[in-house]
């Protein structure tokens, strides 16, 4: 019997709220010797972790459910909240079920967090995942292949057996299937945003940070089948793209507030690891070379990734607006997020030249006052409707 929408969303919400990662503990306990590797936003090659027989687990901070006490002692106050809440998770034992942590190349703060983790958790595997700033296969490609090879060898030692090319190819195929399902979810949401609200889509995506990819793919398919059976009212809301939330995630209440203000979010950059690679990775040939080519030539465009050409800045954002039929863009970035806030003026300039309406605000993962954001988003939605009617 197919699961009901209520059961699917209940499962997703339970995974989202569980800061003790009980689902990970249960996965490990099911087969003795299993290992879990945590990773932070924005992107890591999860295929390598999966091919090693381990569970990749997205660590997206403590959200608005946890008070940060110990974590504040390791960082100054004028930075984003996610590194401090992640430290709080570690220092309070909530991440003890992780056998290692991967810290992607996002910003200086996360790079420094990887060093803190090495000092504080000496019994855990820790690696900073550097990525190329040069997109030539012979330069940046070789560098990235080397980085992935080091990770592959390290995880092989941790697993007690080498990570083979065949295992990598099989994992690439698994994640290709997952990316297809995620894209189907986003396409459906863009076509019927009243039917699949972003507050639900977000929970379904976040479940994929905890579940094995095979289970997450099935969950998405089940959600799409279940939500299609619902009868939900269509409203005259403004269609918007929400961008800037690629690392520290907004509280769920903020997403709901934007929707309640009269906006349909038809594209976003939440949980970007799910959509970082823009198409399928060939599951034949040299797996690390294929993963490298996908990153260099067919990956997303965000503030944490270097743009080689000035004219490329904002190209994918404009494409997203047009492809998903959006009427405007909401820039929602965490306070003190240097990559997002430094890039914002450049993207706003691109949108202005394209006559695409936009507005902007900042948040923290524990933002509690939603009224100002709801009022701003509502005013933006109203102005879009007035402009389009003029």
Please tell me what each predicted stretch does.
Residues 60-66, 131-134, 269-273, 364-365:
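Short, acidic/turn-prone active-site loops that include or flank metal/cofactor-
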Residues 314-328, 332-390:
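TerminUS-proximal long segments
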Residues 74-92, 305-318:
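Glycine-rich, highly charged phosphate/nucleotide-binding loops
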């Amino acid at each position: 019997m197919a699961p009901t929408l209520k059961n699917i969303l209940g499962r997703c919400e339970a995974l989202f709220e569980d800061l003790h990662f009980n689902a990970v503990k249960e996965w490990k306990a099911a087969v003795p010797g299993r290992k879990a590797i945590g990773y932070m936003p924005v992107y890591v090659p999860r295929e390598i972790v999966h091919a090693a027989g381990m569970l990749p687990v997205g660590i997206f901070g403590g959200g608005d459910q946890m008070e940060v006490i110990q974590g504040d002692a390791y960082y100054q106050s004028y930075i984003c909240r996610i590194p401090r809440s992640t430290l709080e998770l570690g220092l309070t034992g909530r991440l003890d079920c992780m056998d290692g942590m991967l810290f992607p190349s996002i910003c200086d703060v996360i790079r420094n967090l990887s060093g803190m983790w090495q000092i504080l958790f000496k019994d855990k595997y820790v690696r900073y995942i550097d990525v190329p700033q040069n997109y030539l296969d012979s330069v940046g490609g070789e560098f990235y292949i080397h980085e992935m090879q080091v990770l592959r060898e390290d995880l092989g030692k941790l697993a007690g057996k080498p990570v083979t090319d065949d295992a990598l190819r099989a994992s690439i195929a698994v994640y290709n299937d997952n990316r297809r399902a995620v894209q189907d979810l986003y396409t459906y949401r863009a076509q019927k945003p009243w039917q699949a609200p972003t507050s639900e889509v977000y929970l379904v995506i976040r479940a994929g940070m905890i579940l094995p990819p095979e289970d997450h793919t099935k969950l998405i398919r089940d959600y799409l089948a279940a939500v299609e059976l619902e009868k939900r009212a269509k409203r005259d809301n403004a269609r918007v793209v929400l961008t800037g939330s690629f690392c520290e995630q907004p509280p769920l209440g903020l997403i709901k507030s934007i929707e309640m203000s009269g906006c349909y979010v038809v594209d976003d950059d939440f949980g970007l690891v799910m959509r970082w690679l823009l198409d399928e990775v060939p599951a034949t040939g040299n797996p690390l070379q294929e993963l490298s080519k996908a990153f260099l030539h067919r990956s997303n465009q965000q503030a944490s990734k270097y743009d080689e050409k000035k004219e490329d800045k904002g190209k994918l954002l404009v494409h997203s607006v047009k492809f998903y039929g959006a009427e405007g863009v909401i820039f929602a970035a965490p306070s003190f997020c240097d990559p997002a806030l430094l890039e914002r003026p450049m993207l706003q300039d691109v949108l202005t030249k394209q006559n695409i309406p936009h507005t902007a605000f900042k948040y923290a993962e524990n933002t509690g006052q939603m009224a100002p954001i709801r009022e701003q988003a509502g005013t933006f939605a109203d102005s879009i409707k007035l402009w389009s009617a003029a």
